[in-house]
Every structure is written in C-alpha cells, then in structure tokens.
C-alpha cells in the first residue's frame, strides 16, 4: 500500500536534503539537523534541534521519531522522548529533544543525520469499560516474569 507524505521545508532549511531512506529495506527515513553552523551538547545536556521540515500525513497515520543507533552507540546521543509522535493533524516544524548521555561533548553540525522517522498506520479502537478482563496464563505477571 502506498501513501503520500507531503513535506514542506522551513525557509531556513531550503539547502538541506529531504528525509531519505538510506537502504532498500530501511523502515525509517533519516532526518537532518537544521542548526546554524553547529551546536555542541555537553554530557547530560538537552538541546532542542530543529529539522527544518513540516509534514502532512494522511488521516489515521502517525510519524514516529526515533534515535539513530550509531549516534547512541558511538556518542551517547539519543532522543529524550522516544519514540516521539507526530500526529496527522500537526503542521508545525518537527523538532527533536536531543540528550547527550555520553561522557564527552558532542557537536551536531548543520545537515547531519540526527534521527529517523517511521510512518505507521494508527488504529483508534472503540473504548468500553468492563468489570472483568478475560483470563490468560500470564495474567498480571509483568516486569521480569520470564526471567532476566
């Protein structure tokens, strides 16, 4: 099934690439940092990094914004609210809440691939309140119930 994702660049991001899939089987398309020059994030610091894009999703779709694994592994750079959700009725610029969990300052440069965006279909179920839920073998055994 094919859908259309409409993308508008902000005025200050006309020179940046559009989001792109980096391999044939990639689930997420890379997003680019729309910073002026560069931004250094010290260990433990949080920065709001703009992407320079606004999107229009079809109804009943969302965009999930996720960290890039290489940045997390090599530098401790990740997204604070992951995955971030972009709703189909949001039209503002996508911005990333980036945190440095590493031990060294990390410099983010303009145009650097900083996160990835995955498009998913959304199901909105009818919600009903009940007095009981059906029984399962697991029931309410949660965290660590299958072993560590």
Swiss-Prot record:
GO molecular function, one term: dUTP diphosphatase activity
Binding site for substrate: 68-70, 81, 85-87, 95
Lineage: superkingdom: Bacteria
CDD domains named in the record: trimeric_dUTPase
Key words, A-Z: Hydrolase, Magnesium, Metal-binding, Nucleotide metabolism
Reaction catalyzed: dUTP + H2O = dUMP + diphosphate + H(+)
Keyword Membrane belongs to the record: no
Pathway membership: Pyrimidine metabolism; dUMP biosynthesis; dUMP from dCTP (dUTP route): step 2/2
E.C. no: 3.6.1.23
Cofactors demanded by this protein: Mg(2+)
InterPro entries, alphabetized: dUTPase, dUTPase-like, dUTPase-like_sf, dUTPase_trimeric
GO biological process: dUMP biosynthetic process; dUTP catabolic process
Recorded family membership: Belongs to the dUTPase family.
Protein purpose: This enzyme is involved in nucleotide metabolism: it produces dUMP, the immediate precursor of thymidine nucleotides and it decreases the intracellular concentration of dUTP so that uracil cannot be incorporated into DNA.
Protein name, as recorded: Deoxyuridine 5'-triphosphate nucleotidohydrolase
Source organism of the structure: Caldanaerobacter subterraneus subsp. tengcongensis (strain DSM 15242 / JCM 11007 / NBRC 100824 / MB4) (Thermoanaerobacter tengcongensis)
